[in-house]
A protein has these predicted regions:
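Active-site neighborhoods and metal-handling regions in enzymes and metal-associated proteins
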Residues: 1-298
C-alpha cells in the first residue's frame, strides 16, 4: 500500500474539476450541429465551466477534420460547423488542479473512425493501473485502432496533469513502446487516443490562437506590459486564448511578447496527409488497485 491520501484536498479538487468537465463536455457536444457557430460553442462551454465553479484550464479546442489539437476560435470567428468530423477538447481547473477530456462529434459520416478512438480509450482504461508500464497502455490503444483498419497518431500522447501544469510526466503513448514510465498510485493522467485514416503523424500548421507564459520579464512597451500582467494574474502558467485578452491591441502585444520569448504559441496540429482525426480522452487518478475516472459522464 502507498501512503497517498486519496481524500486530500488535492484529489477532491481534481474530482470536482472532473465532475464539472463531464457535464460541460456532454452538453457542449449536444450543441455541435451543422450551421452552429464554433465561437458560440466555445464561449458557451467556457462560461458554463465558470458558472459551475471551475475555470477553463485551457481554451476550448474545436478541431475540424484533419486538425488534431490547438485549434480554438478567433475573437470574431464566424466559422460554422458543416458536415465534418469535430473534436472537442476541454479542460477545467479548480484552484490549479486539473481535469482534461475530449470527444469526437461526427457530422461527416465517418462513424467507424470515431468509434475506434472511443473503443481504444475503453481498452486503455481496462489496462491502466498502478505498476503498469505506459507502453502496455499504448499497445492496447494501437491494437484496437489498427483492428478498425486505421492508425493511431503516434506523435501525440496522453500526459500527466500537475498543479497549474497541463502537461507533465508521464507521457502515455498511443502505440506500443518499450521501457516506458510506470504508473504509480496518486498519479493524475489524461489518457488520449487519437485515430486517423492517414499515416498517423501530425505536423504544425501556421495558425496560432493559443499561447502560454514562458517566463516572467520586464517589458517596456506599455500595452505588452498590461497584457503580460493579465496573463500572469489570470492564467499563470496555463494556456490562454488570444480572444481572452482585454486589450484591443492584444495581437500586437502578443507578437512582442513572443519576440522576447516571454510567451510561446501553440500552432494548430494537423494530420500530415490531410486525413481525418478522431479523439477520445478521460482523466484518471491512479489508485491502489486500478484507476478512478474523474471525467466520466454522471
Amino acid at each position: 500500500m502507498s501512503d497517498v491520501d486519496f481524500e486530500s484536498e488535492q484529489y477532491e479538487k481534481c474530482r470536482e474539476a472532473g465532475e464539472i468537465l463531464a457535464q460541460v463536455r456532454d452538453e457542449a457536444a449536444e450543441r455541435v450541429e451543422v450551421g452552429v457557430s464554433h465561437l458560440e460553442v466555445a464561449e458557451w462551454a467556457e462560461a458554463k465551466i465558470r458558472e459551475l465553479g471551475g475555470e477553463p484550464a485551457f481554451p476550448v479546442n474545436i478541431s475540424i477534420d484533419e486538425e488534431a489539437a490547438h485549434a480554438t476560435p478567433e475573437r470574431d470567428d464566424d466559422s460554422t460547423f458543416g458536415e465534418e468530423m469535430v473534436n472537442l477538447d476541454i479542460g477545467v481547473h479548480v484552484d490549479g488542479w486539473l481535469a482534461d477530456t475530449a470527444v469526437t462529434v461526427d457530422l461527416s459520416g465517418h462513424d467507424e473512425l470515431a468509434a475506434a478512438s472511443e473503443e481504444a480509450l475503453d481498452a486503455a482504461l481496462d489496462v491502466a493501473g498502478p505498476g503498469v508500464d505506459v507502453g502496455q497502455i499504448g499497445a492496447a490503444v494501437e491494437e484496437v485502432i489498427e483492428g478498425y483498419g486505421f492508425n493511431p497518431v503516434v506523435n501525440l500522447t496522453g500526459h500527466g496533469l500537475g498543479h497549474w501544469e497541463q502537461h507533465t510526466a508521464p507521457n502515455i503513448p498511443n502505440r506500443e513502446v518499450s521501457q516506458g514510465a510506470t504508473l504509480e498510485p496518486g498519479d493524475v493522467v489524461a489518457i488520449e487516443p487519437f485515430a486517423t485514416d492517414g499515416r498517423g503523424k501530425v505536423q504544425e500548421g501556421s495558425d496560432e490562437e493559443i499561447f502560454a507564459l514562458e517566463r516572467e520579464a520586464t517589458v517596456r512597451d506599455r500595452t505588452a506590459r498590461q497584457v503580460l500582467e493579465q496573463i500572469t494574474e489570470e492564467f499563470k502558467t496555463l494556456p490562454f486564448a488570444a480572444r481572452w485578452l482585454d486589450s484591443p491591441r492584444a495581437t500586437m502585444a502578443l507578437r512582442r511578447l513572443k519576440q522576447q520569448d516571454v510567451v510561446h504559441g501553440y500552432p494548430v496540429l494537423k494530420e500530415q496527409d490531410g486525413k481525418f482525426v478522431s479523439q477520445k480522452e478521460h482523466t484518471v487518478i491512479v489508485t491502489e488497485d486500478g484507476v478512478e475516472v474523474t471525467t466520466r459522464s454522471r
